[in-house]
Amino acid sequence: LCMIKLYAQSEVIPGLFTTYQQDERILWVIPDSLLGRDMSLTTTILEGAGRKKKSADAKFGYQGDRFGPRILRWEEEKEQIILKEIRSYVDTSGSYSLGSLLSEREMPLTLQEFEILGCEKTGKIIDVTEWLRDGKLWGLQPFSFLIGIGSEREGRVTAILGTPESVIVRSERIYEAVERTPATSANGEVTRWKLGCCLRLLPRHLMQVRYASSGVGYFTVPYAHMEPGSCQVISDRVVKRWRLEVADRDTARYRRGELVEPRQKIRIYIDRSFPEKWRPYVLRAVNNWNALFERSGFKNAIAGLMAPDSAGFTLDNSALSWIVYKASPMENAYGRPFVDFRTGEILSCHIAVFHSVFDMLCQWYIAQTGESEEEFLDELAGRLLEMVVSHEV
């Protein structure tokens, strides 16, 4: 194949994939080294739609809400680049004879086929212009019931950002009205949303799994594997957990019982939209967990941090974990881990604190303490918020 002729005035956006963009035309260079590698795709709401009416029970549809991940893989077949989705995974490492047969049984789903337009020294060039407008992968369509939207009326790409480990596609999308659902009480509203979709390279080496036990109350994901010498696929469950590993240089110290810092710490960032007076309590809620990690041999394993006001710290960067304040009448909070279902590894998390959670906390406190406190002061509210966020962490 010949090198495609790119316009001299095209904007070049470096990153996981090099992007060439001129006007509305967008080309990607898929590196040969990334063919066959697995990637995660997450969708984040950057600006939610304003609605005249919204149910107090609506959990999703706010700035910062993240959905996914979906596991995708690029492959080259018959002079085409094929995008596939991995929807199931069976660990065949214990079976030396049936692994290939099982791979056929668990065949990935083909999502898109791209003509190879040309090549660079390290990769193949494909046109993704129309594909990036498709709301089935780059929009909210797969999550429409959760946020109460109809079919997509219009969508356009507004920006593409690149990092060495990811590419972020930002878009504006308009959705038709939908009849009343549990997610919304609004009827007849056409809504506009700003989204960020992050395609991120997953680690080459899978994390070692930890099988679940009914005696220990961890959250889990389904897992299938084959044992050596067996022809049976065993259905099991593995624990959702962070990849906390001892650095090679600290192995001896760790085995002697000394506290060591993990190779990669857990960092959870507080969104700058979080009200300033509550920030100290939220930071403490995260950092309180260090005492528990020390019992596993790790010091400074987790840190709550205020998000810096810099370009790389955005809500749609799926490498980052966030605590976000939601202007919602819902009296609650929630924490969602985003998990690699192949191993149970937590890739990132999103913790939401709804504004009206303070109504619930006030009611709880008064119901349990009666008139022992004369006023529900900010300092008391902050300590109760710290309890809630610690629970979600």
What feature does the model see in each segment?
Residues 1-3:
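Sec-dependent N-terminal signal peptides
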Residues 6-274, 292, 301, 307-385:
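Auxiliary tRNA-acceptor-end handling modules of aminoacyl-tRNA synthetases
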Residues 278-285, 381, 385, 389:
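Stable alpha-helical elements in mature extracytoplasmic
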Residues 281-299:
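A short alpha-helix/helix-coil micro-patch that ends at or immediately precedes a cysteine
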